[in-house]
Amino acid sequence: MLADGVPVTMRSSAPRHRAKASAPPSMTPRPIRIFDTTLRDGEQSPGASMNLAEKMEIAQALVALGVDVIEAGFPIASPGDFESVRDIAAAVSGATVCGLARCNDADIDRAWEALRHARQPRIHVFLATSSIHREFKLRMNEAEVLARAVAGVTRARRHCADVEFSPEDAARTEIDFLCRVVEAVIAAGATTVNIPDTVGYATPSQMHHVIKSLRDRVPNIDRAVISVHCHDDLGLAVANSLAAVEAGAGQVECTINGIGERAGNCSLEEVVMALKTRQDHYAVETRITTRKLVPTSRLVANITGIQVPRNKAVVGRNAFAHEAGIHQDGMLKERRTYEIMRPEDVGLERTDLVLGKHSGRAALADRAKALGYQLTAEQLQTVFDQFKALADRKKEIYDGDIAALCELQFAALPEQFTFEGYTVTTASGATPTVTLRVLQNGVPQAVTITAGDGPIDAIFLAIEKLTGI
């Protein structure tokens, strides 16, 4: 660890020659870290908020999937975010657990408070660096931004040996200044430097140029892992991430199903399968167990309510569907004529099995597992009994029905609540007030709150406050 006050030698403008990022196919593939931010950036998708139990379920699925880093949340953002980061950090093993913080002492200390019991903690600090952010958001000059970035990393290193720094809006930051910032934060102790395309503005050739420039012009770049975090506003998040890997990036930040703010983030399943399918080109490898991609994708879709488009690459229901006669003929003769990936490699099993009232417990358990649910024997029996009752009323049971029955097992309340009634007071432009009344194990309980984006949201917030889920 570097001591405070170590001078930084700025030699960013002098190009340095390095070995090519991609190794020849005959060499051992270069490892690429997968940093999943479904629980933080992904949750910023409108309507994608998750409770603690759901976040914990996704976190455990991400560990099983093989991700290297789980960004569990932004601890200072809310008490709920703090609790989820704290509980996930304490429970998860097998992956680094990361918390986000701005470059100020309060954020960083709060992040560490949430992460302190993690087996492998990481503090991720960020500060905008582009000229438009410096002028209009931060109202700071280059020297002030540089000093605050260094101070943030230095503070984080006092708590944690693993510190990531992100120059927000890096893709629109002047390359000379970006190189100076990266060199300074590495000297201050950053172990990962993440390059975000915050607004999804970059192109693949531009992203390649930025990463290559950092590798060539930052003298101490070998002391940190270069990461990339791309948004999908122009539909280029995956392409930009692949270009960054090709230029030498060692970590890709992404989300399951590509969910995230606005148009979303780089899709984990797409970038992972691109790197695996075209390993001949990229000469890299990840730790991802790809056969768990589809189950994890469906789990996240079921929890967030953001369904996967049928034609989405890798995990969409049509990703391995062939209807054209010529394609079907080729597939019957040799699958490789029209398939560059095997469906079983991503966890999609081709089956004509239709579940109905004559189906058995084993078939139901197999389908539930394929949808991403690990049921205990007791949970399976409960779901099976409910499934049989439903099958008597419906000719055919769909995946959504099975998922709904399984979700009931994971959403069970620790105590019995009986709904009694509610009162809502609202007006145009006003924040609604809700009074919710329930019986908790026969004892009357009530709560009144003034919050929410409309009466329905307010009711759900009241339920959450009263029940604690």
Regions found by a protein language model. Give the residues of each.
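N-terminal capping/small domains of soluble enzymes
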Residues: L2-D4, V8-N104, D352-R361, A365-A370
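A mid-to-C-terminal "edge-of-domain" accessory segment
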Residues: P24-I32, D36-T38, M273-L275, Q279-V443, ...
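Hydrophobic faces of well-ordered beta-strands that scaffold small-molecule active sites
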Residues: I34-T37, I70-A72, A95-A101, P121-V125, ...
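Active-site beta-loop-alpha junctions enriched in small/polar residues
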Residues: R40, P75-A77, L100-N104, F126-S130, ...
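Alpha/beta enzyme core
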Residues: S45-D68, V85-A91, D105-D222, L242-A247
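Structural signal for hydrophobic packing residues in well-ordered secondary-structure cores
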Residues: V63-G66, A89-T96, L115, R119, ...
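Catalytic alpha/beta core domains of metabolic enzymes, predominantly
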Residues: A202, H209-H322, I326-K333
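Conserved mixed alpha/beta catalytic, RNA-binding, or beta-rich assembly cores of soluble enzyme
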Residues: A430, T448-G468
